[in-house]
Amino acid sequence: DYKIIISNYHIVICKNVIYKYMSSLKKISLKDIAEAAGVSTALVSFVLNGKKKEYRVGEETAQRILKIANEMNYQPNLAAKSLRSGKTKTIGLVVSDISNPFFSQLTRVLEDEATKQGYTVLFGSSDEDASKMNHIVGSLLNKGVDGLMIVPCENSEKFIASLVNDNIPVVLFDRYFPEINVSYVALNNFNAAYVSTKYLLDSGYNAPCMVAYDVNLIHMKERVRGYKKAMSDAGKKKMINVVFLKQDSPKKSADRLLPKMVESGADAFLFGTNMISLACLYTIKDMGQEVISKIGLVGFDGNPVFDFFYSPISYIRQPIDVLVQKALGILVDNISNGNTVQSVLAEGEFIEMAP
Protein backbone atom coordinates (compact mmCIF):
# COMPACT_ATOMS: atom_id res chain seq x y z
CA ASP A 1 0.00 0.00 0.00
CA TYR A 2 1.10 3.51 -0.78
CA LYS A 3 0.43 6.43 1.49
CA ILE A 4 -0.42 9.74 -0.15
CA ILE A 5 0.47 12.70 2.00
CA ILE A 6 -1.10 16.00 0.94
CA SER A 7 -0.25 19.11 2.85
CA ASN A 8 -2.59 22.05 3.34
CA TYR A 9 -0.39 23.98 0.88
CA HIS A 10 -1.03 21.44 -1.86
CA ILE A 11 -4.74 21.49 -1.12
CA VAL A 12 -4.80 25.28 -1.61
CA ILE A 13 -2.85 24.99 -4.87
CA CYS A 14 -5.23 22.33 -6.16
CA LYS A 15 -8.25 24.39 -5.20
CA ASN A 16 -6.86 27.40 -7.08
CA VAL A 17 -6.12 25.31 -10.17
CA ILE A 18 -9.59 23.76 -10.09
CA TYR A 19 -11.18 27.18 -9.48
CA LYS A 20 -9.34 28.74 -12.42
CA TYR A 21 -10.33 25.82 -14.63
CA MET A 22 -13.96 26.05 -13.60
CA SER A 23 -13.82 29.82 -14.04
CA SER A 24 -12.71 29.33 -17.62
CA LEU A 25 -15.80 27.20 -18.26
CA LYS A 26 -18.38 29.60 -16.90
CA LYS A 27 -19.17 33.26 -17.31
CA ILE A 28 -17.62 35.18 -14.43
CA SER A 29 -20.13 37.48 -12.75
CA LEU A 30 -19.75 40.55 -10.57
CA LYS A 31 -20.89 38.38 -7.66
CA ASP A 32 -17.97 35.98 -8.22
CA ILE A 33 -15.50 38.84 -8.13
CA ALA A 34 -17.17 40.34 -5.07
CA GLU A 35 -16.92 37.04 -3.16
CA ALA A 36 -13.26 36.62 -4.09
CA ALA A 37 -12.46 40.21 -3.09
CA GLY A 38 -14.57 40.16 0.06
CA VAL A 39 -16.59 43.22 -0.95
CA SER A 40 -20.13 43.94 -2.13
CA THR A 41 -21.30 43.41 -5.70
CA ALA A 42 -22.18 47.11 -5.90
CA LEU A 43 -18.61 48.07 -5.03
CA VAL A 44 -17.27 45.81 -7.79
CA SER A 45 -19.71 47.40 -10.24
CA PHE A 46 -18.57 50.92 -9.31
CA VAL A 47 -14.91 50.03 -9.88
CA LEU A 48 -15.36 48.13 -13.15
CA ASN A 49 -17.54 50.90 -14.57
CA GLY A 50 -14.97 53.58 -13.80
CA LYS A 51 -16.95 55.18 -10.96
CA LYS A 52 -14.55 54.58 -8.07
CA LYS A 53 -13.96 58.30 -7.48
CA GLU A 54 -17.65 59.11 -7.72
CA TYR A 55 -18.44 56.56 -5.01
CA ARG A 56 -15.22 57.16 -3.05
CA VAL A 57 -13.80 53.67 -3.36
CA GLY A 58 -10.33 53.42 -1.83
CA GLU A 59 -7.45 53.02 -4.29
CA GLU A 60 -6.14 49.85 -2.61
CA THR A 61 -9.59 48.24 -2.72
CA ALA A 62 -10.10 49.30 -6.34
CA GLN A 63 -6.76 47.85 -7.41
CA ARG A 64 -7.53 44.57 -5.61
CA ILE A 65 -10.87 44.31 -7.41
CA LEU A 66 -9.27 45.03 -10.80
CA LYS A 67 -6.52 42.49 -10.15
CA ILE A 68 -9.00 39.77 -9.20
CA ALA A 69 -11.22 40.58 -12.20
CA ASN A 70 -8.19 40.25 -14.47
CA GLU A 71 -7.07 36.97 -12.88
CA MET A 72 -10.57 35.56 -13.26
CA ASN A 73 -10.61 36.66 -16.90
CA TYR A 74 -13.77 38.68 -16.36
CA GLN A 75 -15.51 39.76 -19.57
CA PRO A 76 -18.27 42.36 -19.20
CA ASN A 77 -21.68 41.50 -20.60
CA LEU A 78 -21.76 44.14 -23.31
CA ALA A 79 -25.21 43.14 -24.49
CA ALA A 80 -26.68 43.63 -21.03
CA LYS A 81 -24.77 46.85 -20.58
CA SER A 82 -26.04 48.21 -23.88
CA LEU A 83 -29.61 47.31 -22.94
CA ARG A 84 -29.26 49.26 -19.70
CA SER A 85 -27.58 52.29 -21.24
CA GLY A 86 -29.05 52.11 -24.73
CA LYS A 87 -25.47 52.35 -26.05
CA THR A 88 -23.08 49.77 -27.50
CA LYS A 89 -19.99 52.03 -27.56
CA THR A 90 -19.48 51.22 -31.23
CA ILE A 91 -19.18 53.57 -34.19
CA GLY A 92 -19.75 52.71 -37.82
CA LEU A 93 -17.37 54.07 -40.47
CA VAL A 94 -18.05 53.88 -44.20
CA VAL A 95 -15.29 55.03 -46.57
CA SER A 96 -15.34 55.08 -50.34
CA ASP A 97 -12.24 52.97 -50.96
CA ILE A 98 -10.15 51.45 -48.17
CA SER A 99 -7.26 50.89 -50.62
CA ASN A 100 -6.93 54.66 -51.00
CA PRO A 101 -4.03 55.70 -48.69
CA PHE A 102 -6.02 58.70 -47.43
CA PHE A 103 -8.92 56.54 -46.26
CA SER A 104 -6.61 53.86 -44.87
CA GLN A 105 -5.00 56.55 -42.75
CA LEU A 106 -8.42 57.88 -41.75
CA THR A 107 -9.44 54.42 -40.53
CA ARG A 108 -6.23 53.95 -38.56
CA VAL A 109 -6.44 57.36 -36.86
CA LEU A 110 -10.14 56.95 -36.07
CA GLU A 111 -9.54 53.56 -34.46
CA ASP A 112 -6.87 55.07 -32.21
CA GLU A 113 -8.91 58.13 -31.27
CA ALA A 114 -12.11 56.14 -30.72
CA THR A 115 -10.32 53.68 -28.44
CA LYS A 116 -9.22 56.57 -26.23
CA GLN A 117 -12.89 57.41 -25.72
CA GLY A 118 -13.97 53.82 -25.13
CA TYR A 119 -15.44 53.19 -28.58
CA THR A 120 -14.89 50.38 -31.05
CA VAL A 121 -15.02 51.08 -34.80
CA LEU A 122 -16.76 48.85 -37.34
CA PHE A 123 -16.08 49.82 -40.92
CA GLY A 124 -16.87 49.06 -44.53
CA SER A 125 -15.94 50.30 -48.00
CA SER A 126 -18.61 51.43 -50.46
CA ASP A 127 -16.43 51.36 -53.60
CA GLU A 128 -18.22 54.58 -54.62
CA ASP A 129 -21.46 52.62 -55.04
CA ALA A 130 -24.56 54.13 -53.43
CA SER A 131 -26.46 50.85 -53.15
CA LYS A 132 -23.48 49.16 -51.51
CA MET A 133 -23.09 52.10 -49.14
CA ASN A 134 -26.77 51.82 -48.15
CA HIS A 135 -26.36 48.09 -47.51
CA ILE A 136 -23.26 48.58 -45.35
CA VAL A 137 -24.94 51.30 -43.30
CA GLY A 138 -27.97 49.06 -42.80
CA SER A 139 -25.74 46.23 -41.57
CA LEU A 140 -23.93 48.56 -39.17
CA LEU A 141 -27.22 49.83 -37.77
CA ASN A 142 -28.42 46.24 -37.31
CA LYS A 143 -25.29 45.61 -35.27
CA GLY A 144 -26.37 48.43 -32.98
CA VAL A 145 -23.75 51.11 -33.66
CA ASP A 146 -24.35 54.30 -31.70
CA GLY A 147 -23.48 56.60 -34.59
CA LEU A 148 -22.07 56.77 -38.10
CA MET A 149 -19.18 58.53 -39.82
CA ILE A 150 -19.72 58.36 -43.56
CA VAL A 151 -17.73 59.35 -46.63
CA PRO A 152 -20.77 59.68 -48.91
CA CYS A 153 -20.68 58.66 -52.54
CA GLU A 154 -22.53 60.04 -55.52
CA ASN A 155 -26.33 59.63 -55.54
CA SER A 156 -26.54 58.95 -51.80
CA GLU A 157 -28.27 62.21 -50.86
CA LYS A 158 -31.71 60.71 -50.24
CA PHE A 159 -30.30 57.94 -48.08
CA ILE A 160 -28.25 60.36 -45.97
CA ALA A 161 -31.34 62.56 -45.57
CA SER A 162 -33.33 59.54 -44.36
CA LEU A 163 -30.72 58.85 -41.66
CA VAL A 164 -30.98 62.47 -40.51
CA ASN A 165 -34.78 62.28 -40.47
CA ASP A 166 -34.56 59.14 -38.31
CA ASN A 167 -32.41 61.07 -35.80
CA ILE A 168 -29.46 58.73 -36.23
CA PRO A 169 -26.20 60.45 -35.17
CA VAL A 170 -24.30 61.01 -38.43
CA VAL A 171 -21.20 62.98 -39.37
CA LEU A 172 -20.17 63.20 -43.02
CA PHE A 173 -16.43 63.15 -43.66
CA ASP A 174 -14.41 64.58 -46.58
CA ARG A 175 -17.59 65.22 -48.59
CA TYR A 176 -21.00 66.60 -47.75
CA PHE A 177 -24.28 67.71 -49.28
CA PRO A 178 -24.98 71.45 -48.77
CA GLU A 179 -28.72 70.90 -49.18
CA ILE A 180 -28.89 68.46 -46.24
CA ASN A 181 -28.82 69.78 -42.68
CA VAL A 182 -26.24 67.32 -41.34
CA SER A 183 -22.91 67.63 -39.53
CA TYR A 184 -19.75 67.36 -41.63
CA VAL A 185 -15.98 67.74 -41.41
CA ALA A 186 -13.94 68.32 -44.54
CA LEU A 187 -10.96 70.08 -46.06
CA ASN A 188 -11.43 73.61 -47.34
CA ASN A 189 -11.12 72.31 -50.88
CA PHE A 190 -11.66 75.66 -52.57
CA ASN A 191 -8.73 77.27 -50.75
CA ALA A 192 -6.54 74.20 -51.25
CA ALA A 193 -7.04 74.21 -55.02
CA TYR A 194 -6.65 77.99 -55.19
CA VAL A 195 -3.31 77.88 -53.35
CA SER A 196 -2.07 74.99 -55.48
CA THR A 197 -2.95 76.71 -58.75
CA LYS A 198 -1.39 79.98 -57.61
CA TYR A 199 1.79 78.10 -56.73
CA LEU A 200 2.03 76.73 -60.28
CA LEU A 201 1.41 80.18 -61.78
CA ASP A 202 3.92 81.85 -59.44
CA SER A 203 6.45 79.16 -60.38
CA GLY A 204 6.32 80.33 -63.99
CA TYR A 205 3.90 77.87 -65.52
CA ASN A 206 1.66 79.58 -68.02
CA ALA A 207 -1.17 77.12 -68.63
CA PRO A 208 -1.91 74.76 -65.72
CA CYS A 209 -4.57 72.18 -66.47
CA MET A 210 -6.72 70.59 -63.78
CA VAL A 211 -7.50 66.88 -63.84
CA ALA A 212 -10.66 65.90 -61.92
CA TYR A 213 -13.15 63.08 -61.69
CA ASP A 214 -16.40 63.30 -63.62
CA VAL A 215 -18.54 63.20 -60.47
CA ASN A 216 -21.15 65.44 -58.89
CA LEU A 217 -19.57 65.61 -55.43
CA ILE A 218 -18.87 68.75 -53.43
CA HIS A 219 -15.18 68.13 -52.74
CA MET A 220 -14.41 67.78 -56.45
CA LYS A 221 -16.62 70.71 -57.45
CA GLU A 222 -14.93 72.93 -54.85
CA ARG A 223 -11.46 71.97 -56.06
CA VAL A 224 -12.41 72.78 -59.63
CA ARG A 225 -13.92 76.07 -58.47
CA GLY A 226 -10.74 76.98 -56.59
CA TYR A 227 -8.63 76.25 -59.66
CA LYS A 228 -10.86 78.36 -61.89
CA LYS A 229 -10.87 81.27 -59.44
CA ALA A 230 -7.07 81.30 -59.20
CA MET A 231 -6.75 81.26 -62.98
CA SER A 232 -9.32 84.05 -63.31
CA ASP A 233 -7.62 86.19 -60.65
CA ALA A 234 -4.34 85.79 -62.55
CA GLY A 235 -5.93 87.11 -65.74
CA LYS A 236 -5.95 83.68 -67.36
CA LYS A 237 -9.68 83.07 -67.58
CA LYS A 238 -9.43 82.11 -71.25
CA MET A 239 -6.79 79.51 -70.42
CA ILE A 240 -8.90 77.60 -67.90
CA ASN A 241 -8.73 73.94 -68.82
CA VAL A 242 -10.32 71.11 -66.83
CA VAL A 243 -10.31 67.50 -68.00
CA PHE A 244 -12.54 64.92 -66.34
CA LEU A 245 -11.55 61.28 -65.91
CA LYS A 246 -13.99 58.43 -65.53
CA GLN A 247 -13.82 57.32 -61.91
CA ASP A 248 -14.11 53.63 -62.78
CA SER A 249 -11.35 53.78 -65.44
CA PRO A 250 -9.04 56.75 -64.67
CA LYS A 251 -5.93 55.33 -66.37
CA LYS A 252 -7.77 54.74 -69.63
CA SER A 253 -9.18 58.28 -69.53
CA ALA A 254 -5.77 59.75 -68.70
CA ASP A 255 -4.11 57.94 -71.61
CA ARG A 256 -6.68 59.42 -73.95
CA LEU A 257 -6.85 62.99 -72.62
CA LEU A 258 -3.50 64.05 -71.14
CA PRO A 259 -1.40 63.82 -74.33
CA LYS A 260 -3.97 66.05 -76.04
CA MET A 261 -3.64 68.61 -73.23
CA VAL A 262 0.14 68.69 -73.54
CA GLU A 263 -0.10 69.05 -77.32
CA SER A 264 -2.50 71.98 -76.89
CA GLY A 265 -0.09 73.82 -74.57
CA ALA A 266 -0.70 72.61 -71.00
CA ASP A 267 2.59 72.95 -69.11
CA ALA A 268 1.42 71.85 -65.63
CA PHE A 269 -1.20 69.63 -64.03
CA LEU A 270 -3.19 69.96 -60.82
CA PHE A 271 -4.48 66.50 -59.90
CA GLY A 272 -7.83 66.46 -58.10
CA THR A 273 -7.07 63.46 -55.81
CA ASN A 274 -4.12 61.24 -54.98
CA MET A 275 -5.67 58.38 -56.95
CA ILE A 276 -5.95 60.67 -59.98
CA SER A 277 -2.27 61.48 -59.46
CA LEU A 278 -1.32 57.80 -59.62
CA ALA A 279 -3.30 57.19 -62.80
CA CYS A 280 -1.86 60.26 -64.52
CA LEU A 281 1.76 59.68 -63.51
CA TYR A 282 1.86 56.46 -65.51
CA THR A 283 0.52 58.32 -68.54
CA ILE A 284 3.02 61.17 -68.15
CA LYS A 285 5.88 58.68 -67.74
CA ASP A 286 4.97 57.16 -71.10
CA MET A 287 5.23 60.60 -72.74
CA GLY A 288 8.99 60.54 -72.27
CA GLN A 289 11.65 62.44 -70.34
CA GLU A 290 11.39 65.59 -72.45
CA VAL A 291 7.77 66.11 -71.40
CA ILE A 292 8.40 65.01 -67.81
CA SER A 293 11.19 67.56 -67.33
CA LYS A 294 8.97 70.47 -68.43
CA ILE A 295 5.68 69.63 -66.73
CA GLY A 296 4.78 71.06 -63.31
CA LEU A 297 2.89 68.69 -61.03
CA VAL A 298 0.76 69.31 -57.93
CA GLY A 299 -1.66 66.90 -56.25
CA PHE A 300 -3.82 66.29 -53.21
CA ASP A 301 -2.36 64.16 -50.42
CA GLY A 302 1.10 62.68 -50.52
CA ASN A 303 1.89 59.17 -51.63
CA PRO A 304 5.10 57.12 -51.24
CA VAL A 305 5.00 56.51 -54.99
CA PHE A 306 5.65 60.21 -55.56
CA ASP A 307 9.19 59.82 -54.21
CA PHE A 308 10.08 57.49 -57.06
CA PHE A 309 8.74 59.62 -59.90
CA TYR A 310 11.11 61.39 -62.26
CA SER A 311 9.84 64.86 -61.41
CA PRO A 312 9.00 66.44 -58.00
CA ILE A 313 5.31 66.44 -57.07
CA SER A 314 4.19 69.07 -54.59
CA TYR A 315 0.88 68.49 -52.84
CA ILE A 316 -1.75 69.62 -50.38
CA ARG A 317 -1.49 67.72 -47.12
CA GLN A 318 -4.79 67.27 -45.31
CA PRO A 319 -4.64 67.52 -41.48
CA ILE A 320 -6.05 64.02 -41.03
CA ASP A 321 -5.54 63.94 -37.25
CA VAL A 322 -7.39 67.24 -36.79
CA LEU A 323 -10.17 66.21 -39.17
CA VAL A 324 -10.73 62.90 -37.39
CA GLN A 325 -10.64 64.45 -33.91
CA LYS A 326 -13.18 67.09 -34.95
CA ALA A 327 -15.47 64.54 -36.60
CA LEU A 328 -15.29 62.10 -33.69
CA GLY A 329 -15.88 64.89 -31.20
CA ILE A 330 -19.04 65.98 -33.01
CA LEU A 331 -20.28 62.40 -33.35
CA VAL A 332 -19.73 61.50 -29.69
CA ASP A 333 -21.40 64.75 -28.64
CA ASN A 334 -24.42 63.95 -30.82
CA ILE A 335 -24.58 60.40 -29.46
CA SER A 336 -24.52 61.66 -25.87
CA ASN A 337 -26.56 64.83 -26.12
CA GLY A 338 -28.73 64.55 -29.23
CA ASN A 339 -28.13 65.74 -32.75
CA THR A 340 -26.79 69.26 -33.15
CA VAL A 341 -25.61 70.16 -36.64
CA GLN A 342 -21.99 71.29 -36.71
CA SER A 343 -19.72 71.90 -39.69
CA VAL A 344 -15.95 72.19 -39.93
CA LEU A 345 -13.77 73.17 -42.89
CA ALA A 346 -10.09 72.68 -42.07
CA GLU A 347 -7.21 74.26 -43.97
CA GLY A 348 -4.65 72.08 -45.72
CA GLU A 349 -0.89 72.58 -45.79
CA PHE A 350 0.93 73.06 -49.09
CA ILE A 351 4.03 70.87 -49.25
CA GLU A 352 6.54 72.05 -51.84
CA MET A 353 8.87 69.38 -53.15
CA ALA A 354 12.20 70.73 -54.31
CA PRO A 355 13.44 69.80 -57.81
Cite the ranges covered by each PLM segment.
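Flexible loop/turn connectors
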Residues: 255-355
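N-terminal helix-turn-helix/winged-helix DNA-binding helices
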Residues: 23-29, 69-102, 106-108, 117, ...
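Structural motif
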Residues: 122-142, 193-194, 242-263
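N-terminal helix-turn-helix DNA-binding module of bacterial transcription factors
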Residues: 1-87
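Flexible loop/hinge segments that line or gate small-molecule binding clefts
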Residues: 150-195, 275, 301-313
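Short beta-strand elements in bilobed, periplasmic/extracellular small-molecule ligand-binding domains
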Residues: 114-125, 207-210, 228-251
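Hydrophobic alpha-helical segments within soluble ligand-binding/sensing domains
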Residues: 183-210, 229, 250-259, 277, ...
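An alpha-beta-alpha
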Residues: 194-235, 342-355
